[in-house]
């Protein structure tokens, strides 16, 4: 790639609106969710350029053409963005074999946050016709060493005579040849090369496709997916590795429900929410947030925005292990956690019991219950069955909370007597919708869809929204939004 060149003053003036650039040059206007620079040709066709940043003037080579858009590889930068920085990892880039785990290391962190905030606001407006009354300050944290969970692929490359352990190559099914990873905690990143040697030494080295990493505050667990039984010798090698590197091994011979520790009796994985005096034990395959620092800030921010009073009842939808439920129980009169996975419900109850037992007199947890319910099949009748609550906390997976918010909207439409509204069970007219909803999202598109239902059909206003930089250097957008009754 050529070195950036300073344009002449005349060229700079001519190109302020993207016109007048030399033939073949493109002015990058923005960045999309796949971290591609977005430009337009003179005929209006959109060009998505790998590796290009907003405000840059570039040349690019097209590798995919459609009627209204193209995808292209960056070939030269003629004017470089002031926010272009040197990547922090030698495995990041556009070169062959580059790791695909990160997409934005070449963009200054302030630029990454700005791109994600714009993506959030654009999705809310263009997909949902929703404009927040206030944009929240972004939640930010460490740029490196933040990723406490990772799914590492394993591949025995026979032609090279090596075992690779890491993320997939950029736009490829192959495993990147990576010796380090600065987004992992240092103690976890230091395991990459020893893991390669370990897997190569196993009798089952050809049948171990994946290692899942899960770090707690003081324990690191590794889940080995193996497609054939491990030999006695393999068990011994795993134990020796665990002793040398201070990790726990868990084995997964089939599906997720088959995961078991190699040896019983080890210290339990857990993380703390110190602002609330909460300790959260978890299993390595349980869903927990990738970034523990951001999670602590996010929980505190969500509860401040919800502003729960001691006389209020709160429902935490998609509650998981109780990441929000238990902190809510330090503030509310009563809390209900609703989760689709019955096993998680059982562990959430156990976590509540543990923290209740550890609670000091000034921090006894509120009356708290957990129930299992398929939240993707929610109906107005089911929603009414959970009872009224003053406030809701909603933290769905990427699919969003469509059935839940649609049930709420259907109830509101029926109460208003809207034409074609769903008929509700007797007594529904006495049900009171929540005054405030705090919605934590990991997908801005489904957030926008659900926000549209809440605002346009359920009688809410979007009081605030902002991005949460849970995944620095990646294109993933976490966000938080507040909805209040109009």
UniProtKB/Swiss-Prot annotation:
Active site residues according to the UniProt entry: 442
Binding site for S-adenosyl-L-methionine: 289, 318, 323, 339, 374, 395
S-adenosyl-L-methionine as UniProt keyword: yes
All residue ranges annotated as the TRAM domain in the record: 14-76
Positions of [4Fe-4S] cluster binding: 89, 99, 102, 181
Pfam name, any one: tRNA_U5-meth_tr
GO MF entries: 4 iron, 4 sulfur cluster binding; iron ion binding; RNA binding; rRNA (uridine-C5-)-methyltransferase activity
BP GO annotations: rRNA base methylation
Catalytic activity, as annotated: uridine(1939) in 23S rRNA + S-adenosyl-L-methionine = 5-methyluridine(1939) in 23S rRNA + S-adenosyl-L-homocysteine + H(+)
EC number: 2.1.1.190
Enzyme class of the recorded protein, top EC level: transferase
Keyword field contains Cell cycle: no
InterPro entries: 23S_rRNA_MeTrfase_RlmD, MeTrfase_TrmA_CS, NA-bd_OB-fold, SAM-dependent_MTases_sf, U5_MeTrfase_fam
Keywords: 4Fe-4S, Iron, Iron-sulfur, Metal-binding, Methyltransferase, rRNA processing, S-adenosyl-L-methionine, Transferase
Function: Catalyzes the formation of 5-methyl-uridine at position 1939 (m5U1939) in 23S rRNA.
HAMAP family: 23SrRNA_methyltr_RlmD (MF_01010)
Similarity comment text for this entry: Belongs to the class I-like SAM-binding methyltransferase superfamily. RNA M5U methyltransferase family. RlmD subfamily.
Cited NCBIfam families: PRK13168.1 (NF009639), rumA (TIGR00479)
PANTHER family from the UniProt entry: RNA M5U METHYLTRANSFERASE, TRNA (URACIL(54)-C(5))-METHYLTRANSFERASE
Name the record gives this protein: 23S rRNA (uracil(1939)-C(5))-methyltransferase RlmD
């Amino acid at each position: 790639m050529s070195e950036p060149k300073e344009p002449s003053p005349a060229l700079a003036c001519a190109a302020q609106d993207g016109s007048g650039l030399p033939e073949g040059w493109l002015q990058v206007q923005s960045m999309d969710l796949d971290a591609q620079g977005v430009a337009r040709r003179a005929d209006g066709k959109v060009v998505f350029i790998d590796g290009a940043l907003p405000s840059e003037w570039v040349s690019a080579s097209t590798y995919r053409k459609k009627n209204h858009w193209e995808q292209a590889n960056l070939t030269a930068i003629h004017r470089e963005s002031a926010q272009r920085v040197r990547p922090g990892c030698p495995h990041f880039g556009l070169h062959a074999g580059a790791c695909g785990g990160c997409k934005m290391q070449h963009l200054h962190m302030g630029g990454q946050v700005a791109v994600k905030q714009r993506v959030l606001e654009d999705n809310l407006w263009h997909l949902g016709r929703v404009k927040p009354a206030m944009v929240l300050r972004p939640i930010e944290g460490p740029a490196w060493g933040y990723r406490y969970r990772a799914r590492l692929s394993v591949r025995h490359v026979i032609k090279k005579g090596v075992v690779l352990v890491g993320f997939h190559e950029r736009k490829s099914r192959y495993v990147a040849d990576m010796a380090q990873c600065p987004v992992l905690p240092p103690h976890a990143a230091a395991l990459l090369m020893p893991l390669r040697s370990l897997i190569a030494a196993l009798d089952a080295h050809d049948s171990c496709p994946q290692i899942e990493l899960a770090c707690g505050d003081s324990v690191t667990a590794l889940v080995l997916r193996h497609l054939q039984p491990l030999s006695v010798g393999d068990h011994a090698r795993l134990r020796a590795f665990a002793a040398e590197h201070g990790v726990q091994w868990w084995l997964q011979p089939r599906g997720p429900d088959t995961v078991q520790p190699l040896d019983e009796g080890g210290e339990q994985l857990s993380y703390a929410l110190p602002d609330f005096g909460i300790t959260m034990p978890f299993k390595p395959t349980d869903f927990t947030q990738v970034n523990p620092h951001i999670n602590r800030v996010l929980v505190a921010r969500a509860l401040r925005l919800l502003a729960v009073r001691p006389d209020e009842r709160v429902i935490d939808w998609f509650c998981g292990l109780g990441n929000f439920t238990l902190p809510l129980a330090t503030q509310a009169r009563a809390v209900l956690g609703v989760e689709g996975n019955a096993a998680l419900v059982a562990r959430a109850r156990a976590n509540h019991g543990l923290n209740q037992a550890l609670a000091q007199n000034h921090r006894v947890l509120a009356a708290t219950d957990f129930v299992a319910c398929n939240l993707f099949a929610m109906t107005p009748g089911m929603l009414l069955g959970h009872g009224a609550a003053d406030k809701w906390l909603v933290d769905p997976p990427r699919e969003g909370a469509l059935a839940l918010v649609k049930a709420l909207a259907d109830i509101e439409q029926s109460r208003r007597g809207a034409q074609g509204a769903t008929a509700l069970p007797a007594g529904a007219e006495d049900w009171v919708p929540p005054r405030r909803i705090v919605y934590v999202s990991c997908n801005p598109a489904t957030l926008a869809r659900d926000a549209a239902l809440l605002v346009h059909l359920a009688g809410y206003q979007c009081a605030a929204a902002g991005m949460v930089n849970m995944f620095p250097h990646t294109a993933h957008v976490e966000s938080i939004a507040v909805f209040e009754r109009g």
